[in-house]
């Protein structure tokens, strides 16, 4: 499944349309009610489901981009013969492909060594993702996504969607201190969770303070449902006091 969108499309308008087809773009951000798809492309966005699904660059299939010569080009993954044809072009587009290819070939070791060893990197200019030596695929989108519009102006995106998976379970863990947090997170990751989120005692106090406002937004029925879901946690806090950190691990699908 995929969708073709323009950069000005707000995610809050986009998601309901995908949900009608029981699919979703999983790399949405916490600010999904405010952001547009163009900003998400430029920022190589990620969010609560990134642990399982990854970032925006893993879902871009092709794009239309205006380069500095003022012309619009289709940017999509190319195999080696297609790349060779692009580099033969006596145009600005051909020069772009020749320059990037030359940069990668002449600095291969440095580029590989410069790649951050992290689970999430949205710093931009991920040139190490452009050429895949194993698959022999060259994808300039991997450089453009996350570049904040500095390398070109995106006018259209073709993005991959994934099936919506129902929430199977959520484990809520109360931590009296942070001593074993790292070890606990690694244990939680063994069940292949969709997300692991946390909030501290200050955030919890803030949530209690404005809980009535949340109920107003959800409505009486929605607020009651939310309250019932967290009855066990409320009793736990009554027994043990306010936790230093609450860790929420969500699993979906067949996990």
Describe the function of each predicted region:
Residues 1-29, 41, 45-99, 118, ...:
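N-terminal glycine-rich flavin-associated loop
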């Amino acid at each position: 499944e995929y969708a073709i969108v323009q950069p000005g499309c707000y995610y809050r308008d986009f998601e309901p349309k995908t949900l009608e087809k029981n699919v979703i773009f999983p790399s949405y951000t916490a600010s999904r009610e405010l952001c547009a798809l163009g900003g998400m492309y430029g920022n190589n966005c990620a969010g609560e489901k990134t642990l399982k699904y990854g970032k925006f660059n893993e879902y871009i299939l092709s794009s239309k981009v205006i380069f500095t010569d003022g012309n619009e080009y289709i940017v999509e993954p190319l195999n080696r013969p297609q790349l060779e044809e692009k580099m033969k072009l006596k145009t600005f587009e051909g020069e772009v492909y020749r320059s990037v290819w030359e940069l990668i070939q002449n600095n291969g070791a440095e580029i590989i060594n410069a790649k951050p060893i992290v689970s999430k990197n949205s710093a931009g200019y991920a040139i190490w993702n452009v050429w895949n030596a194993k698959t022999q695929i060259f994808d300039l989108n991997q450089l453009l996504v996350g570049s904040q519009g500095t390398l070109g102006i995106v006018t259209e995106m073709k993005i991959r969607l994934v099936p919506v998976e129902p929430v199977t379970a959520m484990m809520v863990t109360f931590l009296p201190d942070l001593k074993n947090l790292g070890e606990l997170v690694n244990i939680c990751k063994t069940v292949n969770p969709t997300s692991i989120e946390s909030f501290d005692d200050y955030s919890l106090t803030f949530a209690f303070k404005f809980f009535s406002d949340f109920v107003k937004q959800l409505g009486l029925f929605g607020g009651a449902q939310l309250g019932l879901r967290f009855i066990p946690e409320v009793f736990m806090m009554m027994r043990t006091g306010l936790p230093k950190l609450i860790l929420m691990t969500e699993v979906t699908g067949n996990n």
